[in-house]
Amino acid sequence: MIHHKYLNFSTAIFLLIGSFSWAQFIEVNAELDLRRISEGDRQIFITLAKDIENYFLNTQFSAITNDLEMIVDIRLVLESVSQGGSQTTINAQAIFVNKQVQPDGNLKTLDQYFYAKGIQFPYSQGRKMFYTTVFEPLVSFLNYYAFMFIATEMDTWEYMGGTSFFNRAIEISDLGKDSDWSTGWDDRWKKSRKVKSNQYLRSMRFNYFKAWDALYAEDVD
């Protein structure tokens, strides 16, 4: 099912993403809120926002969902920086929302909004991120929400099409709960299971977009 919500900017997408056409995300806008962080510590995060954007844009989270073309805004609120030996630990909150390009070129907020609290991860300036299925606090956190977005999007393309991706998010949160960085992961585990099990809402989303596509097809004809 090809939703008309993407058709208006498909040509621009092709020009923008080039060699990264296999990724699920075509635009990611990451913003850091550093107001609670001291001036001395802020320099640690010079590249973090761009690194997060590049991670989403350049990672193939699934080989079978290459044409989703999602746009996401991420706001990461850094709450504290603590030192323990040679390790720097970050505590944060985050908001993830999906967006859609309008005919006038502006971005409109869509239907997915995720608020994450209790984020904790080790970090060092300039640290690069690479996809892995092994639990890694920051990368696994980003993977979790990538799969949540993919799952909810796939539910609009195919009936219960996001189930396997909800399962991926649940698996990540299982690893997080059992790790040395378990803060917040129980909440994320509950969230992914709750959304996955809400078959009424998931079927409603699929039927809405199915009807929407049928209506658009009639308008085109």
Predicted regions located by residue number:
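Internal, conserved structured core segments that host functional sites
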Residues: 111-176
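Flexible, glycine-rich surface segments
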Residues: 161-221
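Sec/Tat signal peptide C-region and signal peptidase I cleavage site
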Residues: 19-23
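Signal peptide-directed extracytoplasmic domains
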Residues: 86-124
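Bacterial N-terminal signal peptides that target proteins for export
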Residues: 2-10
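Start-of-domain marker
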Residues: 24-91, 102-104
